């Protein structure tokens, strides 16, 4: 296995819901921090083989290509692969783990990785609109709230923290 080194790290500020970053695209934020991280690393963009980013809540159509948009926007080659991962709260960390594995296995000599999310821009989904809401009300689903609720009926994820915290073993 190849050794892995972190050459640089950057991040944006953590914004509050509906705060000063609410109108910022996760792609634009990702490009800004990736460009800065590459600049600090001392590597040229053509020396970076792969980009991996975590993202859960798409805020616009191009977010389906968020990793590709970030890497190309940060100056990486069009030919460099990009991968988006969704592991809910752990997506950014999973991106870093996956990039580490690429380098360890020799599938990349250098990679960029991170997460890009603007929950304030989480949209609403109206399933009936695809084929037409013919008569009656069309239900809307808050995709941000959907991402914060356990799909197996256990409730809001923040509530789950309060449930699990008292039951974890004391170290």
Please tell me what each predicted stretch does.
Residues 24, 55-110, 140, 148-157:
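Conserved catalytic cysteine-centered active-site region
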Residues 21-39, 137:
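Short catalytic helix/loop segments, enriched in acidic residues and glycine
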Residues 1-24, 36:
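Condensing-enzyme catalytic core mediating Claisen C-C bond formation in acyl metabolism
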């Amino acid at each position: 296995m190849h050794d892995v080194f972190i050459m640089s790290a950057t991040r944006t500020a953590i914004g509050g819901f509906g705060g000063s970053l609410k109108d910022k695209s996760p792609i634009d934020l990702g490009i800004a921090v990736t460009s800065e991280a590459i600049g600090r690393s001392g590597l040229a963009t053509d020396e970076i083989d792969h980009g991996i980013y975590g993202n859960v809540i798409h805020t616009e159509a191009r977010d389906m290509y968020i990793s590709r948009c970030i890497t190309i926007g940060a100056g990486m080659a069009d030919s460099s692969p990009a991968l988006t991962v969704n592991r809910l709260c752990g997506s950014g960390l999973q991106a870093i783990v996956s990039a580490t594995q690429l380098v360890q296995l020799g599938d990349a000599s250098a990679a960029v990785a991170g997460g890009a999310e603007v929950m304030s821009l989480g949209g609403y989904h109206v399933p009936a609109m695809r084929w037409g809401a013919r008569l009656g009300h069309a239900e809307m689903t808050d995709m941000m709230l959907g991402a914060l609720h356990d799909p197996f009926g256990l409730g809001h994820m923040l509530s789950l923290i309060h449930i699990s915290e008292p039951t974890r073993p004391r170290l």
